[in-house]
Amino acid sequence: MVRNKSVFVVLLFSLFLSFGLLCSAKDFPGRRSEDDPQQRYEDCRKRCQLETRGQTEQDKCEDRSETQLKEEQQRDGEDPQRRYQDCRQHCQQEERRLRPHCEQSCREQYEKQQQQQPDKQFKECQQRCQWQEQRPERKQQCVKECREQYQEDPWKGERENKWREEEEEESDEGEQQQRNNPYYFHRRSFQERFREEHGNFRVLQRFADKHHLLRGINEFRIAILEANPNTFVLPHHCDAEKIYVVTNGRGTVTFVTHENKESYNVVPGVVVRIPAGSTVYLANQDNREKLTIAVLHRPVNNPGQFQKFFPAGQENPQSYLRIFSREILEAVFNTRSEQLDELPGGRQSHRRQQGQGMFRKASQEQIRALSQGATSPRGKGSEGYAFNLLSQTPRYSNQNGRFYEACPRNFQQQLREVDSSVVAFEINKGSIFVPHYNSKATFVVLVTEGNGHVEMVCPHLSRQSSDWSSREEEEQEEQEVERRSGQYKRVRAQLSTGNLFVVPAGHPVTFVASQNEDLGLLGFGLYNGQDNKRIFVAGKTNNVRQWDRQAKELAFGVESRLVDEVFNNNPQESYFVSGRDRRGFDERRGSNNPLSPFLDFARLF
């Protein structure tokens, strides 16, 4: 009898061992299980049911199968972005001649994984619903949640494609030149504070962290808020005065001050001032377009540092109400402890919360209700906190472009507290916003659409430097600039959507649209309460035309009529000019031509 039991135990152990090997097999030719852990799990469960005796042995077999499935899904669920970075790091160990091919393979593998990831995750989630849930209504709800999680975020692939495009668009040499430019910020210079399924909030690095030349504007911060279609942004307040400028989409901005509530329907061009301490929340009304808002912050506590405070939240962001002691909350709200658990962040709320984060998906009915009663800002108005910049009459305009501007002296309630103007300008393809400089304001210019480039004259970078942003050489650089006063360097940067460029006061600058598409830009004129003036050095209204004849001759060393021939040569066009044929220009420019020195100057632009 004992012998028979021993034989039975040996046979049973061998049977379990064979099933373990079958369930862990990966390399059988022609099997799709290699790419589908879920299918391997289902096959293994079937074998457990068919070939094991007794419910206990079958349960153990299925438990082993489920454990192996979870381990494989955990490996497969690793972040593709992280695997891509690991692959690129591995390429750095290869020989230099093999690195490009290695990195190309990494990109191809990454793209393949990204294309497969959402569908694969949805199918696996759907299959889990089938065998985990017994009741039909629970299965239906489970599948719905899978679909919402993996199939209703079409912008996920768009975001990841944009990351890949950004990595490939510039050569190593071009990236080095842009990094050495203290006035240029690539869109990757924005640091993510909140990046979620339904939106993101990115803040530009502090200006002085890029270079000490920008320390004069270091108290300001620039940020970008993006909300996906039918998305709600949680209520919050900030320890900073803010200006919202809508650059894309349409939505509703609502904020509550200590006195009343303001609510505005917003479209591109709408400017909204959010007073410090006001609780604000937003909703994207559109079913397809993202709502994108550029935000200027002027902190009230610490220059260049601001924080958001959320009364309703769970983990990230956390509700600041939950930080107070329970005794305080029970007293001030006159409520029981059980009811406090129903508040956001409470024990009971965790089970009911539809999602976490700053951005929440909302139904179309909820979005419509949030927009009821909101007003649509108009072009001008001394009352209210919002206006539409693009509904104004352009400050400068012709067939080559348009320039809109709102200054604190005309929009006191909206702009005075932040001490900034807001400008938006559109340059038609192949056209130029003529060289000019600002008397007092420093402009921070963000590219909202299109491509082009900017050229600026800078006295601070006249000396070639391998590291312009080095703080150790700061005093030495400043002393050398003072000794070499009158020496300049041309600062040039390529512009594309999301990039940012800083134009200090007094620095001549020009913006040029590419030959293929228009260039759209948004600018904040910092410290514009000092009554900034814009002085043009080219075009019909250029500054040189008003000089005395003797001043022209003494300055340029030629007769004043020759100076006028250059600076008055374009009497019809002002502010914006089209890119014209250069052949006539080059014919007038010869080695014996007395105009050569300032024809060279003009050609700079």
UniProtKB/Swiss-Prot annotation:
Residues 166-175 have a biased composition (Acidic residues). It is found in: Vacuole, Aleurone grain; Vacuole. Residues 183-341, 387-564 form the Cupin type-1 domain. Residues 52-81, 157-181, 465-485 are annotated as: Disordered. GO terms for cellular component: aleurone grain; vacuole. Residues 1-23 form the signal peptide. Keywords: Seed storage protein, Signal, Storage protein, Vacuole. InterPro entries: Cupin_1, RmlC-like_jellyroll, RmlC_Cupin_sf, Seed_Storage-Functional, Vicilin_N. Its main location: other. It holds the Pfam family Cupin_1. SUPFAM superfamilies: RmlC-like cupins. GO terms for molecular function: nutrient reservoir activity. Belongs to the 7S seed storage protein family. Seed storage protein. This is Vicilin GC72-A. It comes from Gossypium hirsutum. The lineage of its organism: Eukaryota, Viridiplantae, Streptophyta, Embryophyta, Tracheophyta.
